Amino acid sequence: MYKGSVLWGKRIPLPLVKKTLSNGREIETFRDLPETMYGALLRSAEKNPDKCAIEDDLGRVFTYRELVKEVDLFAACLVHKFQMKKGDHVGLMLYGSSEFGIAFLALVKIGAVAVVLPTKYQEQEIDALVEHADLQYILCDTDFEEWFRKYKTLQIMSCKPQEGELVFHSLEDIEGQAVIDEQGGYEDPVVMMFTSGTTSQSKGVILTNYNFLHAAAAYQACFHITSDDSAVIPVPTYMITGLSALFGLFIYAGGTIYMHRFFKADKVLKCIQDKHVTFMHAAPTVYTLLLEEWNKFPKLPSLRCLACGGSRMQKEKIEKIHEWLPHCEFHTVYGMTETTSPGTILPENAIESKHMNSSGIPIPGLNYKIVDENGKELQAGETGEIMVSGANIMAGYYKMDSGLYQNWWLKTGDVGYFTDEGYCYVLDRKKDMINRGGEKITSIDVENVLYQIPGIAEAAVVGIPHKIYGETPVALIQLEKDISVSSKEITEYLKKKLAKYKIPSEIRFTEAIPLTPNGKIDKKKIRKIFIEEEKQETI
């Protein structure tokens, strides 16, 4: 077993305590945490009431004192005007604006469960999630209001954020409502988020106050975040990175959050430049797009720390980012919705680490192990499925017993190994391992070599059915702007670097690699593209 408290305890002071929860679950968490995320907001407001808490891309600015006032007003309105109560399931389908942040914190105060819905989904996809989540209320942007009219028992509140005052102020008598006492508690669920995948297979992940608080405290300790830090949120707030690793972390730490409704690389970089932003956390795809704007923003001296999660970051891209921002530390992160974001973090600056290609070591309060197909724990260097247990692991899946989470140990579905020093190397999703005639291929091995070829911006390798070998690897490639590379040139390069059976039998090009709503490469969709096109060719 690999214990985060031991591995990080050698590097930084860790004020950890052991707690037993009401369900008998034992966790190791940080001392003196507030009871709820709303309590974290109050603590930050008490320390720095006049500090900027949120500024959004509509020009609206809220200090911590003002943010508490707005959250209290909206929570009171939801209770008195809409009869909302603790435990109610409330859909949130808002873009990344001040309204989203205030609504989320108001729901935490009430003790309601925020069911965060992806704004990139289509109506049919949202329908499947709404039916599974047992929603009683929906708070949405007016762009989506009509989608919910067919649900007769669903109370709908819609808004369109705009320049000027909060749209919540248009609600009747919001100023006249009596302030309510906080209803939420440490162990209460606060969020339901859906895993990526097809809507029929998406799992509703239930996260509690203590999950969010531990995740925030761990990030703060590992990245040395203080109230002097600031972050722009370059990813949607319906993703766990946006909601926990950025919004939750900075409310907890008392820093400043810059919220954008939509991602545009130049807009994010201009915000960093003009607002002197110090921290950013994003997926590899975001960093790829930011690198394309390098020439417009050659120096960003305020940035001190970058984190990258969602999927593996290639060595070549890390080196490019270091060339661009040599003063800035870069840390890889491995986690998932079920871990409330953080699972492992590379403790040292990636460019200086001999473990640059790893995902780091377990965060304080988490324990990891590697097991074989029979559940037997494996030793360092042996490859198997990654399992994790600890304080920021979800309460469970909503209305689903998947068998993935038993005795507080979660099967991640990822294949990898640990070194003797406790560094985690994630090799592939278990379901994405390619079996070509009995020879196992990890897609990451092939992708890493593809990224060595100049001009390749993004690459995805998947397995598709083959009459003789069972499966064969194929590759989808996205080239950099104004670059031309042929499939023949790519194949010739791979022949020099890889065993013959690992070389993709087919290479296709695309203008944009398909992504899931959570910002990860959508290998299921890519596999479907190859299979369907192959069927068309045989007709």
Regions found by a protein language model. Give the residues of each.
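ANL superfamily adenylate-forming
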Residues: K18-K19, D143-Y186
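Conserved AMP-binding/adenylate-forming core of the ANL superfamily
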Residues: L33, L42, D50-S97, G101-L105, ...
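Conserved pre-ATP/AMP-binding loop-to-beta segment of ANL
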Residues: P49-D50, G176-F194, S200-Q201, H224-S230
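Conserved structural elements of the adenylate-forming
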Residues: V68-A76, V205-T226, P234, S244, ...
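Conserved AMP-binding/adenylation subdomain of ANL enzymes
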Residues: G111, L213-S230, I240-T278, E293
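Gly/Ser/Thr-rich phosphate-binding loop
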Residues: V277-A282, E292-K354
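AMP-binding/adenylate-forming catalytic core of the ANL superfamily
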Residues: M280, G390, G396, V415-K502, ...
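Conserved ATP/PPi-binding loop(s) of AMP-dependent carboxylate-activating enzymes
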Residues: I361-G365, K376-N407, E439-I441
